[in-house]
Amino acid sequence: MGKNVVVLGTQWGDEGKGKIVDLLTEQAKYVVRYQGGHNAGHTLVIDGDKTVLHLIPSGILRDNVKCIIGNGVVLAPDALMKEINMLKERGVPVEERLLISEACPLILPFHCALDIAREKARGNKAIGTTGRGIGPAYEDKISRRGLRVGDLFNAELFAEKLKEVMAYHNFMLTEYYGCEAVDYETTLKDALAIADYLKSMCTDVTELLDQARKNGDNILFEGAQGTLLDIDHGTYPFVTSSNTTAGGVATGSGFGPRHLDYVCGIIKAYTTRVGAGPFPTELRDEIGDHLGTKGQEFGATTGRKRRPGWLDIVAMKRAVQINSISGFCLTKLDVLDGLKEVKLCVGYQYPDGSISTVTPLAAEGYEQVTPVLETMPGWSESTFGATSIDQLPQAALDYIKRIEELLETPVDIISTGPDRNETMILVNPFS
């Protein structure tokens, strides 16, 4: 009997999901992306060779794995083509192993233009989007005016729908934001040029996954971004435009939620955030510099410097609740090597002196709190590349144990370096 496993981020993204997905896909027949778009950046290092994927599931580097892009993903045809060509140049076969839902909303040039125009108009109140059109594409979906992959297969109807939606968005671009309009004819021509190619990879994803389940195949669902960026449960409005939590699997792929067997929450040994938004445990000192430099904390998609801080247990409790996490994968433990002390945020203190162990429901609430920190001894020994729990110093083991105690959730996998081999699996999610 097969197992259906979800791998998702528990923080603000950049937790190391790509590596863990790649590692676990050795046991999977299907890997499914169910939300987000090419704003994701999943970095995989295999025998020292680095690959960064934004749209195609990380399982593509495993020869026997079928990769699926579900209906919850907003798909930019140009970004998809760029990624396919990059992989083919590296000798990775793609077309025969990539399957796409016809219900995926399309990201088109006017979405990117709107995204950039809006961020510019916000000035110092910018959210920090990637400028890749993700939000505007989801907005069109919710407004029921969006174009989907399947629309490309009827050229006449697509042209009609495109003209209508572009008239609306170009009016906003020119009259409200004072920007140039996006050319309709060019957009139409470029979109239709890829229609037949996309059609060759399209399938009924819901039916495919249900048959795979009945056949006893292992399925892995690959999340993008992180729990604290969820459109409903994150630090709103400093969030992404999709449901990054486990509930997004069902809506973004059509796979029944009762069939999920294990939810693996990727948790970095510290915390980072890229772009704007509240961050109670942020470190703007030499320790923050240490974490950022040693952890090579630069966004895989934008190249932006990430903001580092201590691990926030309060926020992680919310992530456990929302996702019903079965077990954690703790990543980048080695980045803490050499610190005399390590700290965990175990509460939020408000101006009146009260302490809460529950996260606020919006960004404004975070601005009032200061972190209540629990200090633990650090370790001088190197954990980099450790592949056995016996190789970890006692202080590191105590740190891991304390995380498990506070979150009432086991750490089942530990990552001690970027390569897929630099990992210890204590409990196999597929077992």
Swiss-Prot record:
A GO CC annotation recorded here is:
cytoplasm
**Which residues of this UniProt protein bind Mg(2+)?**
D14, G41
One Pfam entry name:
Adenylsucc_synt
According to its UniProt entry, one GO biological process term is: 'de novo' AMP biosynthetic process
Q: Does the keyword Cytoplasm apply?
A: yes
The UniProt keywords, alphabetically, are: Cytoplasm, GTP-binding, Ligase, Magnesium, Metal-binding, Nucleotide-binding, Purine biosynthesis
Could you tell me the superkingdom of the organism this chain comes from? Bacteria
Record-annotated residues binding IMP?
A: D14, E15, G16, K17, N39, A40, G41, H42, T130, R144, Q225, T240, R304
Question: Can you tell me which family this protein belongs to?
Answer: Belongs to the adenylosuccinate synthetase family.
Name of the protein described by the UniProt record: Adenylosuccinate synthetase
Q: From which source organism is this entry? A: Shewanella loihica (strain ATCC BAA-1088 / PV-4)
